[in-house]
Swiss-Prot record:
GO terms for cellular component: cytosol. Its EC number is 2.7.4.8. Pfam families: Guanylate_kin. ATP binds at G12, P13, S14, G15, A16, G17, K18, S19. The keyword ATP-binding applies. The gene is gmk. This is Guanylate kinase. Residues 5-185 form the Guanylate kinase-like domain. Essential for recycling GMP and indirectly, cGMP. It catalyses: GMP + ATP = GDP + ADP. The keyword Kinase applies. Belongs to the guanylate kinase family.
Length: 207
């Protein structure tokens, strides 16, 4: 009997360590997870491949997707648009997959309106703003202006913590991963979001 999947939605500031934690999660639960590949209007960065890291599309194509309700969620981030396909997400859920989103607060709020009963939301951040700044400087991928903008965006997103189901302060990687892992395992077996009537019928037919 295959249970319905759910959406594990991750948000948090750039530099908080989301990608590192998600990589560890996929290493352990690869067969159960489906990573939602976003569509974006921004240009590919070095090493990024279309259809693997993102679906790179034009502004015109993205606008058509908005108009036709193609996206489960979409948002404008740093002058570019990002969005997640509703159809691909639903197909993965129907196949019992845990669909992983790594999206910002804007996208989370839109996705929640369309699929609230399927979403488990986790906000991942650093212990404080200074620690986040240190990590971003160490990463050395942003200009000073971009760095300040990321820090301001992080401050704005921190105001939305109460909207999320869980909060992980990513100060120690092992502890943070165990917390994320525990959230995933607990929600694999919850009754919320399942077709309980169908499950009961299948169970009775097996008598």
């Amino acid at each position: 009997m295959k249970l319905q999947g759910f959406v594990l939605l991750i948000s948090g500031p750039s530099g908080a360590g989301k990608s590192t934690l998600l990589k560890k999660l996929f290493d352990e639960f690869e067969d159960e997870l489906y990573f939602s590949i976003s569509s974006t209007t921004r240009k590919p960065r070095e090493g990024e491949k279309n259809g693997i890291h993102y679906h790179f599309i034009s502004h015109e194509e993205f606008q058509k997707g908005i108009d036709s309700d193609h996206f489960l969620e979409w948002a404008r981030v740093h002058e570019n648009f990002y969005g997640t396909s509703l159809k691909h997400t639903q197909n993965a859920l129907d196949n019992g997959k845990i669909v992983v989103f790594d999206i910002d607060v804007q996208g989370f709020k839109i996705a929640r309106k369309k699929m609230a009963d399927k979403i488990v939301s986790v906000f991942i951040t650093t212990k404080n703003k200074d620690e986040l700044k240190k990590r971003l400087i160490k990463r050395n991928t942003d200009t000073i202006i971009q760095l300040e903008k990321r820090l301001q965006n992080a401050s704005d997103e921190m105001k939305e913590l109460s909207e999320y189901d869980y909060l992980i302060i990513n100060d120690e990687l092992k502890q943070s991963y165990e917390a994320l892992r525990a959230i995933l395992i607990a929600h694999k077996f919850r009754t919320k979001g399942q077709n309980l009537g169908q499950i009961q019928n299948i169970w009775n037919e097996g008598e």
